[in-house]
A protein has these predicted regions:
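Feature captures the catalytic ectodomains and active-site-proximal regions of enzymes
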Residues: 1-513
């Protein structure tokens, strides 16, 4: 074994920003961090966008950051995972969707695509619908109908028309698909058992009943004329030759391309559940091959799931337990779930040999009132744990730069960064004393940008800035490589500990010898 303990120190919300304006990390007096960056191996790491499994350009967050770190691999969120599968081509081999397509061929029936038409990326993404249409075309389907749910909540209130125009152009380009109905998400995507709303969407899709229009564009124009924006568009059936373009019938297939479950459950249940009784279905229950993009609700029968949840096997915590090593997780209340539940891949139960210390966060209305938060207590517990000779690995978090950064109050954020700097110094002294090793990083940025550089308004969100990776008191002569991400940290620690990285971890050690 190597040096002991190995400490992973996470400075929450501590990003690195070239612009020193409204930048608490640059403006604070940080003699410890300044010295560490000069004297020890230091590089900038990526903690946002695709590097952490989020859409390109999206700021990181604490949950995603800790999950990527603990997993030792990039954990793709549903949105990026599906987008990536479309790009890689795996999407077109999806068994559940192929089953829906086969059903259409076997019964000479129609494929219906349901979903929220927007690029909001919260419940769905319009490019995923294009993927489904492309798949239908490749498999020779002709009767393909789209039932659009309009957004206006995760997107601008009247952006729906633009999305419809883009879809119509895309269907022309792909050579398949017709819009059969449109409904605002207020009706089709209720989640509070307001079944009267869902019934209106159901009646448009299944019965061909409701408002009518000659085209999707006519429908949206008429709605805007009445000052009814996307979210609230009354379910409208598109008519061709005095008949609905299409309604959902027995033996048809459905692919519902929303990936977030909560607002997809009710309309799905109204079609799939043979015992459904929340409103009257004039045609009763009839059989369809119904594919949900993700598992909306295990209690909904008669459905298939295209993208099952990926279980994160062999996290760092599990790996340490398998090797009989003792580990400690330490944080104050605000970040306790992050160093435990999220770091363990969404598992609540501690691993064998995993101790946990929770220090209470201060009871103040907002953390600018106490920018040091509970860092001094957390820091003292850390020093004690380092010197105890009890732990092989310590994983801990200082919450200040993030929690105080969220207030947008620069003066307080500077104090928060300074409080953390002092605690880092104490930990470094302790590590040197026992000849342990420490990797310092952050899960995402925040305190390094406290105003919007374009508008001058306070900026309280996370950032897409890089974060520090510093290796303290490890073996002489090691260097860290540039261009790494959070998923590479645990593979680095495993190498530092002289152990073999498990196959499930696809992150790559940052160590350059």
């Amino acid at each position: 074994m190597s040096k002991k303990p190995t400490v992973l120190m996470i400075l929450d919300g501590y990003g690195l920003n070239e612009n020193s304006e409204a930048n608490a990390v640059a403006e604070a007096k940080t003699p410890v961090m300044d010295k560490l960056m000069k004297e020890y191996p230091f590089v900038k790491g990526n903690a946002s966008g695709m590097a952490v499994g989020l859409p390109e350009g999206q700021m990181g967050n604490s949950e995603v950051g800790h999950m990527n770190m603990g997993a030792g691999r990039i954990v793709y969120q549903e949105l990026t995972r599906i987008t990536k599968e479309i790009q890689d081509g795996d999407f077109f081999k999806n068994e559940a969707m192929l089953e829906a397509i086969e059903n259409c061929k076997k019964n000479d029936s129609a494929l219906h695509c349901f979903g929220l038409l927007s690029d909001g990326g919260v419940h769905s993404h319009n490019t995923h619908l294009y993927g489904v249409l492309e798949m239908a075309k490749r498999n020779g389907l002709e009767n393909v109908y789209v039932h659009l749910f309009l957004d206006g909540r995760d997107t601008a209130p009247t952006s729906g028309k633009g999305f419809i125009e883009e879809l119509l152009a895309k269907m022309d380009e792909i050579g398949v698909g017709k819009v059969a109905s449109i409904s605002g998400r207020y009706y089709a995507m209720d989640r509070d058992n307001r079944w009267d709303r869902v019934q209106k969407a159901y009646n448009a899709i299944v019965m061909g009943q409701g408002n009518t229009a000659d085209s999707a564009i006519d429908a949206i124009d008429a709605s805007y004329k009445e000052d009814v924006t996307d979210e609230f568009v009354v379910p409208t059936v598109i008519i061709e030759n005095c008949e609905p373009v299409a309604t959902l019938k027995e033996n048809d297939s459905v692919i519902f391309y929303n990936f977030r479950p909560d607002r997809a459950r009710e309309i799905t249940r109204s079609i799939c559940d043979d015992k459904f009784d929340s409103f009257d279905r004039p045609n009763g229950y009839f059989k369809t091959t119904f594919v949900c993009f993700t598992e909306y609700d295990v209690t909904i029968p008669n459905k298939l799931v295209a993208f099952h949840k990926v279980e994160i096997k062999n996290t760092f915590g599990e790996f340490l337990a398998q090797h009989g090593l003792k580990q400690l997780r330490l944080a104050e209340t605000e970040k306790y779930a992050h160093v435990t539940f999220f770091f363990n891949g969404g598992v609540e139960e501690p691993n064998e040999g995993e101790d946990r210390i929770l220090v209470k966060s201060p009871a103040v209305a907002t953390y600018d009132l106490q920018p040091e938060m509970s860092a001094p207590e957390v820091g003292a517990k850390l020093v004690e744990a380092i010197k105890s000779d009890k732990y092989d690995v310590i994983i801990m978090n200082f919450a200040n730069s993030d929690m105080v950064g969220h207030t947008g109050i620069e003066e307080a954020a500077i104090k928060a960064v300074e409080a953390v700097d002092k605690c880092v110094g104490d930990a470094v002294e302790a590590i040197k004393e026992v000849n342990g090793q420490m990797f310092i990083c952050a899960d995402h940025g925040n305190a390094e940008q406290l105003k919007d550089y374009e508008t001058g308004a306070p900026f309280t969100a996370h950032t897409t800035n890089p974060v520090p990776f510093i290796l303290v008191n490890a073996e002489e002569g090691l260097k860290l490589r540039e261009g790494g991400c959070l998923a590479d940290i645990v593979p680095t620690l495993i190498e530092l500990m002289g152990m073999e990285q498990p196959a499930e971890m696809t992150g790559k050690s940052l160590i350059v010898k």
